[in-house]
Amino acid sequence: NKSKFDKESSELVGILWNQWENDSKNGNYKVYYKKLLVIIEALRKELNAPDIPIIIGGLGDFLGKEGFGKSCTEYTLINKELEKFAFEQDNCYFVSAEGLTSNPDGIHIDAISQRKFGLRYFEAFSNKDHILKPLANENELVDLICSRDHTKSEKIYMQSMDFALGKISYDEFISQVTKINND
């Protein structure tokens, strides 16, 4: 499988489990723990990494309210199963999605929340600990991240997106990429 192939040229140091909304309806929480245990045990065995840290992200508390997420009313029950799993299994750490916000679709987290969640994941991984509340300084850290200069690759990607979305012409795209590469 791809994970085993990737291990040949890189080091696998952790696994991020981000379930999201799919099982947060129709009583699926009742079998969630058992299903997750089968998956995690099989994954650790297949990768020959029995002690690899698993960082488990909770579901956002914006679910069950509007848009495509309106039917996901059992997200708190899934979160309880995820948290229970992380507390009971070795080298598993739960990361709360408390306070994160969604895109207008009501089901996916927005860009700022993705950054906050990423900071929480990093904190859980680097400290090998559960993150049960928003980080005290996450707003300041997100501001710092967002105010930094973009890398050359990021600048080219943004120009590529503008071109793909028809915001700039091909000639403008080539001109901008050439300028970025020459800076």
Name these PLM-found stretches.
Residues 1-183:
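Cell-envelope and extracellular/periplasmic
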